[in-house]
Amino acid sequence: MESESESGAAADTPPLETLSFHGDEEIIEVVELDPGPPDPDDLVQEMEDVDFEEEEEEEGNEEGWVLEPQEGVVGSMEGPDDSEVTFALHSASVFCVSLDPKTNTLAVTGGEDDKAFVWRLSDGELLFECAGHKDSVTCAGFSHDSTLVATGDMSGLLKVWQVDTKEEVWSFEAGDLEWMEWHPRAPVLLAGTADGNTWMWKVPTGDCKTFQGPNCPATCGRVLPDGKRAVVGYEDGTIRIWDLKQGNSIHVLKGTEGHQGPLTCVATNQDGSLILTGSVDCQAKLVSATTGKVVGVFRPETVASQPSLGEGEESESNSVESLGFCSVMPLAAVGYLDGTLAIYDLSTQTLRHQCQHQSGIVQLLWEAGTAVVYTCSLDGIVRLWDARTGRLLTDYRGHTAEILDFALSKDASLVVTTSGDHKAKVFCVQRPDR
């Protein structure tokens, strides 16, 4: 399986206590996390247009039809299949996957075939199709309580279904879609479009706010953990932190403070005090969400061998593709298109480990409560790395084309992947003591 695919704050924000930079001492202590999110009843007083009331847990309707076995799509990476379940209803590349956050028993996938499906992880059984899209479905996700599922296609058509009834409850046509995300504690959907707008809708009423950025695409975004702010990155390298209630930008980073190319990804730490942004300029910037100031810049170090790039292509081809914070140590991971996984020590702002893949990294995710980071790449393999040592723990194979997205269950027992081979796969993760 060695051959490679051809396709390439508001005033309430806690102080920046995690940025007490010090010397060369070894990082061995667990970072004390924020005691928890603010009470939803408090938030509703501050965002009167959003309902934060907890909704009762409902069991999803599990009626549906069982997938018939289908022939695999022959690709360029034949080899062993470590997966437990394969979902094969898509007829083209599968671009996105998300798991329902309440039970982690359902997945939603969207693909190049203009289709999205909600299906069960345990056996691949289809629950329902999210029908009616007219372009490639590039975004899909469940609401915070798993009662709603949203899908979005490249043309900007967004749709929301009630999971238990399988009925469409809302739709909207925005501009060309760049990203989409649910609010962490309310039935509120956010999306960024190519005209520079960030949209926020209350679902299913459709109450809407827009946040106008520069006249260029809003390429990535993330709601901060407090639910009151969002960080959005733009094609011109600008970063904006928005107040979701007031509709104004709290901080704007541009020019030398921003990036020198389009932003590709953004992440926040667990208490929302720090933001990481990545760009095609190959830089990852560490930003204080409180002050809006850049407090660290990470750049890739030269790697002797770059199997996935031709000679002299690194400066033109490399970029930051994915990044994220460890929840238990002051570490951040950055994944690059050239296949480099860089683990940075936030306390000393130094490179701690550099782990090389044979082809470009598509996405990375940290396992909750540990220092293990997962990567998926263009060679069709999922890898698990110990960020403390830089050691490869294990890998999972089974796709015959590049992996385009993946999701990790809350207990890290399942990895769900999507691929250019028209398949989604479920892998059972063997979890040794971390």
UniProtKB/Swiss-Prot annotation:
It is found in: Cell membrane; Cytoplasm. GO terms for biological process: angiogenesis; cell differentiation; positive regulation of angiogenesis; positive regulation of endothelial cell migration; smooth muscle cell migration. The modification Phosphoserine is found at residue 20. It comes from the Eukaryota. One of its GO terms (cellular component) is plasma membrane. Residues 1-63 are annotated as: Disordered. WD repeats lie at residues 89-129, 132-171, 173-212, 214-254, 258-299, 315-354, 356-395, 398-433. SUPFAM superfamilies: WD40 repeat-like. InterPro entries: WD40/YVTN_repeat-like_dom_sf, WD40_repeat_CS, WD40_repeat_dom_sf, WD40_rpt, WD_repeat_multifunction. Gene3D superfamilies: YVTN repeat-like/Quinoprotein amine dehydrogenase (2.130.10.10). Residues 39-62 have a biased composition (Acidic residues). Keywords: Angiogenesis, Cell membrane, Cytoplasm, Developmental protein, Differentiation, Membrane, Phosphoprotein, Repeat, WD repeat. PANTHER family: ANGIO-ASSOCIATED MIGRATORY CELL PROTEIN, MITOCHONDRIAL DIVISION PROTEIN 1-RELATED. Plays a role in angiogenesis and cell migration. In smooth muscle cell migration, may act through the RhoA pathway. This is Angio-associated migratory cell protein. It comes from Bos taurus.
